[in-house]
Amino acid sequence: MQVTDVRLRRVNTEGRMKAIASITIDHEFVVHDIRVIDGNNGLFVAMPSKRTPDGEFRDIAHPISSQTREKIQTAVLAEYERAGELDQVTYEEAGAS
């Protein structure tokens, strides 16, 4: 499995979410709404999720293996850093469509 494309939108918010990404896997499958979060130990990638009726968040899609999770995180964070250096990222207000 290879991440063959990463699209990134930075968000202007006071919270910890810094960007929203979409990835393409093997030129065949797209996953939207992957979030770049500024955590206590640095940036990390959170997979798309939805809130359950009891208030918990459940992943909608997620990698099965830690190796696949690492590939996704590496690709998304590399694009986040690259785009930030080039300042070629679309910024939007959090919650904007």
UniProtKB/Swiss-Prot annotation:
Belongs to the SpoVG family. It comes from Halalkalibacterium halodurans (strain ATCC BAA-125 / DSM 18197 / FERM 7344 / JCM 9153 / C-125) (Bacillus halodurans). It comes from the Bacteria. Essential for sporulation. Interferes with or is a negative regulator of the pathway leading to asymmetric septation. This is Putative septation protein SpoVG. The gene is spoVG. InterPro entries: SpoVG (IPR007170), SpoVG_sf (IPR036751). GO terms for biological process: division septum assembly; sporulation resulting in formation of a cellular spore. Keywords: Cell cycle, Cell division, Septation, Sporulation. Transmembrane segments: none annotated. Pfam families: SpoVG (PF04026).
